[in-house]
Amino acid sequence: MSILNKAILTGGLVMGVAFSAMAHPELKSSVPQADSAVAAPEKIQLNFSENLTVKFSGAKLTMTGMKGMSSHSPMPVAAKVAPGADPKSMVIIPREPLPAGTYRVDWRAVSSDTHPITGNYTFTVK
């Protein structure tokens, strides 16, 4: 194998290791779970695959539907967003108990690689 081929192979291996170390955070689980129907939760917990950079991560809660109202406009829900007990989690704590309806959680997660990853999911309060 020529020196050039060895250098290219070594460079490729180094880059592969570097890129695998820069994994983006993924939402691993949530409470309540996506598409679930639950009693009004006191908090919503989001659990990610990586430690979060709190300063740049966050979430918001929106009520997207209310029983008996066919044309309910989305309404932001007043809530506090805080780091979870685990550095890979965050919690959303609504200021008031959630009334029956459908809700969307929009989240933004940033880990040590500094790339923001966003997503959302819905759940229903019975």
Curated annotation (Swiss-Prot):
Q: Which GO terms describe its cellular component?
A: periplasmic space; plasma membrane
Q: What is the effect of changing residue 24 to F?
A: Decreases affinity for copper(II)
For the ligand (Cu(2+)), the binding residues are 24, 115
Its GO biological process terms?
copper ion transport; response to copper ion
UniProt xrefs under SUPFAM superfamilies: E set domains
First and last residue of the signal peptide: 1-23
Q: Which GO terms describe its molecular function?
A: copper ion binding
For the ligand (Cu(+)), the binding residues are 63, 66, 69, 72, 75
Asked whether the UniProt record includes Transcription regulation among its keywords, one would answer no
- Where does this protein reside within or beyond the cell? Periplasm
User: What Gene3D superfamilies does the annotation carry?
Assistant: 2.60.40.1220
The alphabetical list of record keywords is: Copper, Metal-binding, Periplasm, Plasmid, Signal
What else is noted?
Significant differences in the properties of PcoC and P.syringae CopC were initially reported. The differences were attributed to the presence of an additional N-terminal alanine residue in the initially expressed PcoC protein.
Q: Which PANTHER family match?
A: INNER MEMBRANE PROTEIN YEBZ (PTHR34820:SF4)
Q: What does this protein do?
A: Copper-binding protein involved in copper resistance.
Query: Quaternary structure per UniProt?
Result: Monomer-dimer equilibrium in solution for the apo protein. Dimerization is significantly enhanced upon binding of copper(I).
Family, per entry:
Belongs to the CopC family.
Record's comment describing the protein's domains: Contains two copper binding sites, separated by 30 angstroms, which can be occupied either one at a time or simultaneously. One is specific for Cu(I), while the other is specific for Cu(II).
State the protein's name. Copper resistance protein C
Q: Could you tell me the gene encoding this protein?
A: pcoC
